[in-house]
Regions:
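A substrate-engagement module of RecA-like helicase motors
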Residues: 2-17, 21, 26, 50-58, ...
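N-terminal pre-P-loop "Q-motif" helix
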Residues: 25-51
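Walker A/P-loop NTP-binding motif
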Residues: 39-41, 74-87, 107-111
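Glycine-rich P-loop/Walker A and Walker A-like loops and their local beta1-loop-alpha1 context
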Residues: 64-76
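Conserved RecA-like ASCE ATPase "motif II neighborhood" in helicase/translocase motors
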Residues: 214-224, 237-255
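SF2 helicase catalytic motif II
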Residues: 255-264
Length: 264
């Protein structure tokens, strides 16, 4: 059985007690058991001189099933964050549903941050197609402007974009450049149709990276920078598996420097 140090034990116990008291909760036996299992498992990880895992056995993998009402998210997040900080590793929490991601990012992690002494930053990882490409947006609007000029000469011709689409694109431009929107499709105040979003969504084929004139104001790379400085990264299973399939560290932290939690 893995042995957890007194310091690690006190760190987790103190923060759990602080979290319970701040929220007015009572300790649950099943939650405490789950916290202990995860803490002991991570405490048993042996690192080599380069900070990499020295033991390749499966003893540092836990499969935990807990009933409704356990408080599973806190039961894995609190000890995993504490141990990741202790081991100087990143924590990647992977979920199956958008709802659970939003619960983590908007409720559970802010709650832990505010009601414990754990000093950590977190970010939500998404595929690049969820972000606005400023260059594509500007090019689309330039096309609209040129088409409008042509129509004054040839009024019988139709614009390539519907009026409603033009209004959508102009609104995106105003909101993003005005700082009222971060370029994430999911944080838009209004829905945008798939075809309209596809016109301006970031994609690998058209992205020129640091060579782009809009690189310093790129929504995608701002989000990627946030991931690099985050201690806890929330993602979905598809993104995690795709990143690992590409060798790792394309979007998410390097796998050898990470602790992974797969929630359902």
């Amino acid at each position: 059985m893995q042995i957890i140090s007194d310091h690690q034990k006190q760190l987790i116990q103190a923060n759990y007690s602080q979290w319970l008291e701040s929220n007015g909760y009572q300790a649950r036996r099943s939650q405490r058991e789950m916290i202990a299992i995860i803490a002991r498992m991570l405490a048993g990880v042996t690192l080599d001189a380069e900070g990499l895992r020295a033991d390749e056995s499966m003893q540092h993998v836990s499969l935990i099933e807990a009933g409704t009402g356990t408080g599973k998210t806190i039961a894995y997040a609190l000890p995993a964050i504490a141990m990741a900080l202790e081991l100087d590793k990143k924590l990647v929490i992977s979920t199956a549903t958008i709802n659970l991601q939003e619960q983590l990012v908007n409720v559970d992690l802010p709650n832990l941050q505010a009601n414990t002494s754990l000093d950590f930053k977190y970010a939500l990882a998404k595929g690049r197609q969820r972000y606005l490409c400023v260059n594509k947006l500007k090019l689309r609007l330039q096309d609209v402007s040129r088409a409008a000029g042509d129509l004054t000469l040839f009024p019988d011709e139709e614009s390539s974009l519907a009026d409603a689409t033009v209004v959508q694109l102009e609104a995106l431009d105003q909101h993003y450049l005005g700082g009222r929107w971060d370029g994430d499709q999911d944080s838009l105040e209004h829905e945008i149709g798939y075809e309209d979003w596809r016109l301006v969504a970031a994609d690998r084929a058209s992205c020129s990276g640091k060579k782009c004139v809009h690189y310093s104001n790129c929504a995608l790379f701002k989000a990627r920078d946030a991931l690099r400085t985050a201690d806890v990264v929330v993602a979905n299973h598809d993104l995690v598996l795709a990143d690992l399939a590409m060798g790792g560290a394309n979007i998410l932290p390097p796998p050898e420097q990470s602790i992974f939690v797969f929630d359902e």
